[in-house]
Amino acid sequence: MTSNEHDQETVHTKVREGYGAIARQGGSCCGPAKSCCGGGAAEAVAAAVGYDEAELAALPDGANMGLSCGNPTAIAELRPGEVVLDLGSGGGFDVFIAGRHVGADGRVIGVDMTPDMLSKARKNIVVYREKTGLDNVEFRLGEIEHLPIADNSVDVIISNCVINLSPDKPQVWREMSRVLRPGGRVAVSDLALLQSLPPDITKMVEALVGCIAGAVMARETEQMAKEAGFEKIILTEKRGYIEALTEWKDPLFKKILENLPAGSKMSDFITSLYVSAKKPLA
């Protein structure tokens, strides 16, 4: 194993352990179950990033874990009959929402590298079927850098606050290009940097698991998408999410604020970012 491969596996291990604990304990990336993002506040997080009450009410209990930083299904323009892939599907939140959009003739596949999350999501399938009458979702174990998905087999890829966790983001974008059919679409919500974070923050394990330490500049995301062959790339900043977390006095964000330069705000450094792109037809 090379030094780079070792570093990547270390990141995967930390993220897998962190999200495994979240799945078992019912917390969120922001902290344990009693923190701002756990329990009832998960609905507040979802509302703040654009999910409507009807979507949330139709979800199986526990699928919404407060792990969102945007609403990728809102920009995905999902159509009946499409095959959708969710990168880092967690408890199945966006998979179940997308399933209602694509209907009985469509299919939604969630990929996650954390066995505890997969177990939680698969248990939720039963309730999803009862609520919707649909049998159109599945969950697979795998890393988003090495997707267990066939070439040219997916119409749309969605992802919600996950790509920042990857230690090899260019490879994630190459994998997205590989599995998408020609003309396929990407609709991603993630966190992005507005300026570089202080080293003390980028070294924090909880900041990595909390989707902060692994974030990159928006222009870097655009460049990775271009190099992977995507076109019609659109980046849209959504700063309200970071401001909302600051107002909710999230414990992780409070700790990060303590390590920022005096007088700085979290929203000076990081933003929620929507990314849409298309794979060329030829």
Per-range role (PLM):
Residues 192-212:
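Short, glycine-/aromatic-enriched active-site segment of Class I SAM-dependent methyltransferases
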Residues 2, 226-282:
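C-terminal lobe and adjacent flexible extensions of AdoMet/dcAdoMet transferase-like proteins
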Residues 170-185:
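A short glycine-rich, Lys/Arg-flanked "PGG" loop and its adjoining helix->strand segment in the class I
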Residues 2-45:
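N-terminal auxiliary segments of SAM/dcSAM-dependent transferases
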Residues 39-83, 94-101:
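Conserved alpha-helix/loop element of class I SAM-dependent methyltransferases that forms part
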